Structures are given as C-alpha cells and as structure tokens.
Amino acid sequence: KGYQYLPVVLKVIAMTTIKNVSEHQAGICVTMSVKLPAILTRQLAQTSCPSLPDPMNRYGYLAPQYGGLRIRACPSGTIYSENQCRYKSNMNGNGGLRGSARKQFRQCSAEFKINFDDGFKDISKGGLAFDYSHISLRRGKGVFVGNSKLYIWGFQSRFLGKTFAIRMKVKIKRGAGKYRPEPIISNCGPNGDSSVEIVVHRGKVIFKAKTSDNPEAVFITEDYDDDKWTDLTYYYDGNHFGGSCNGRPFRQRTGGNLEIRDNPMTIGLCTGQNGFHGEIDELEIYTACIPKDM
C-alpha cells in the first residue's frame, strides 16, 4: 500500500504521462503519485472502454484496479482488440484462424474450469488467479458449508461485455437458502451489487444479469430438487440473457454489456450474506465464446 508497481510493459504510459518517473524507474516500485488515477481516467475516457491495450503484448490487456493498471491475459486462441474493447479470434494474415486457434474456437474452450478431481486446480488454459478457503473435498466434489468460498481474482474489474457463459453441476443441500439467499456464484462484494449471479433462495434457483442498457437487473427463477445433482447454465450474448436448470431452458431479451464490478467472481459466499450449503462437482466459465449446447 502506498506504492504502485510500474512494469516494463507500462513504460510508454509511465514515460509520457507521469513526469516524476524516469526511464530507469520503469519496472521498479515507486511512490504512487496522486496524479495516477486522473491519468488513467483520461486514458480510458478517450475510448469509453474500461480497458487498455498492452503495448508490448497483443495477447493481453490492461485493466484499472486500485488506482493502477493490472495486466490481464486473453483466453487461449484470442488477442485483444482495442476497437472492439474485448477479445477476438486470432486471425492470420490471410484472414483465417491459425490451426491451434481454429481448434480452440471449434471446441469453445473455458477460461476457467475446475472439477475438484485433482483438488483445487484450474484445468483450463486461462491462467486466472484464484484462491479458496474452508472448502473440503469429498469423492472429487467440493463441499461448501456456509463459510466456504472460491474467489477468482482474474474477474475483478473485468470487462465481460457481450459474451459470457457459466456451466456448473451442483447439489443443493435441503434447507439451503430457506431464510436468506445463498450465492452459488456471483461477482458480489463491497464494491457494488452483483451484475452476474446465481443464488438459491426459498426453494428456487435465481439467475441474475445486470446490463448497461437496462436500469433494472433481469431475474429468472427456476425450480430444483433438494439433495440431487442439478445442471445449471448461464449465458449472455449481447441480445439475450439465458440459461437452463436441469435442461429446462429460459431466455429473455436484453442488451448492452454486462456491467463491470470491482469484485472477484466468487463461488459460495458474499460479504454480509449466508454462504452456500451444498456440493459443486464442475464449474466452467467462458468469456470468448458460448458453447453451442447452451
């Protein structure tokens, strides 16, 4: 705290916008200037996009966080597009997908995937930072007991835009959410209400999406069976918010971008709420594509 790291990839920004940082200081910790947030604000306001291209790495981008910039990686098979303010498929000079990227997109790869078979391991190639607490393992399942949570830091301050999807398999314990909502997955937290969320409350699974074109969030409510495995899907494609609960599909028209939250994507627990009681077998999160079977 009180310091801001300026890595080498930010050298162009540091040298041209912060007068008290010299060339030899790029890449070391320097005392943070109060001018930095204003500089970032101007940089981002020029495009109305909540992220900036990484001048040294087309496979990543820069996102504001805690008054500074954080380097984010694009999903495998994609590059960052400043014009589109999001990932796009990695095209070669002839306008076609490279072989590896073509395979990635045909398969629609998840950016984060965990199934608890090998413990707490992200088995995707997304490389997102995450952490967990108070989750136990039972026969390849994650057991959540009310104070358990897994939080994915890679989604903090993340631009989700018009392409986002979740697939998960859960077993909701009888009585879960009887008195207060229990979040299964959400970008809830102290820095704003959630824009993406699946919770259990009073015998229902409730799906939520908050987009930039709508003043009110969209909520969809579905039934489920206690103590039985439930397949959940959630997607937003820029025009519709949809998903399914045990194969029963839902879809509602909406528009705009999923709103950004300066919170990590959290599984199992939100600040000030009851935590989830149940088990999770699989969790997949997609940001570059939506699987065709959703």
Curated annotation (Swiss-Prot):
InterPro entries: ConA-like_dom_sf. Keywords: Secreted. It is found in: Secreted. It comes from the Eukaryota. Disulfide bonds: none annotated. Component of the organic matrix of calcified shell layers like nacre and prisms. This is Shell matrix protein. It comes from Mytilus californianus (California mussel).
